Amino acid sequence: MPQPSFMAPGALVRAAASAFVLAAASSAVLAQGTAYVSSEKDNALTMIDLATLAVKGTIPTCKRARHIQLTPERQIMVACTDSNQADLIDPASGKSVRRIALGDEPEAFDLSPDGKVIYVSNEDAGEASFIDTASGKKLRSVKVGAEPEGVKVSADGKTLYVTSEVASLVHVIDTATGKVVKNIKAGKRPRRMAITPDGKELWITNELGASVSIVSTATHEVIDTLKFEVKGARAEDITPVGIQMTSDGKRAFVGLGRANHVAFIDVASRKVGSLVLVGKRAWNVTLDKAQARLYVVNGLSDDVTVVDVAGAKAIKSVPVGRVPYGLVIVE
């Protein structure tokens, strides 16, 4: 008969302490930091504590806060469409430190890798503007298709991609010359983009095409199209917009708009693995640093759905400002 094994009291204490530390460390991965959510109607950012998943305050900003992004200096930059400005906010103090003119109707932007240039889509003018971050001066404007929105810069900073919603095009712009070098025919009403970490593919969400166009960055040709289906949802309600990839490039997450779901996609096979029910009009999506939780901004239910990535399950809905648009995380 096997003899029972016993752990010495000291070893038992050490094991328990070790388990506690590991559990605390695991929890800390999820618990540190703050999510900042822009709101189109409240002219403010809502702050969500990542430890408690509770709202801990708001920060006033300029009018109709939309696209939001971290600068290389870890400041928060938010485009305010009705103020024609970017608001630069210091997360440590929670205060605006500077406002930068972005031209008429700025909706989305991206930053050069060094943060020295802001590339912004000006919807009414049908232009992409290059803004010097330090001086706030416009360096140039590039004429693009009607209603430009999504803006994405390549990792080397040499190529700028801008979507045109009306023309169903993605314009490929040389950042050194400001010249449009190619127009890519995407799906209907292209909105946002993600570049795979290896730089080889550009993924474009097509809001009215219920799809993602996949483009080779070597040839700037569409090489595949991923179509979405959601059981019980009308085809016209499947309106993909926000997209983000994991740092290893293996998975992509897409907010499916009025279908009220977020899609988990295997990048290699280009197949949807899971569909997670979230709030109304799932718009933009953001992963935390550990890539353990996905934060989904829901524009019509005025909340953020927190999704456990491993379990592909919504774990909490956090009420935020009216018509929330984008979200960044400072950890």
Question: Which role does the model predict for each range below?
Answer:
Residues F6, G10, A24-E331:
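Predominantly soluble domains enriched in secretory-pathway, periplasmic, or organellar proteins
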Residues S18-A19, V29:
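Cleavable N-terminal signal peptides
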Residues P2-A17:
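Bacterial N-terminal signal peptides that target proteins for export
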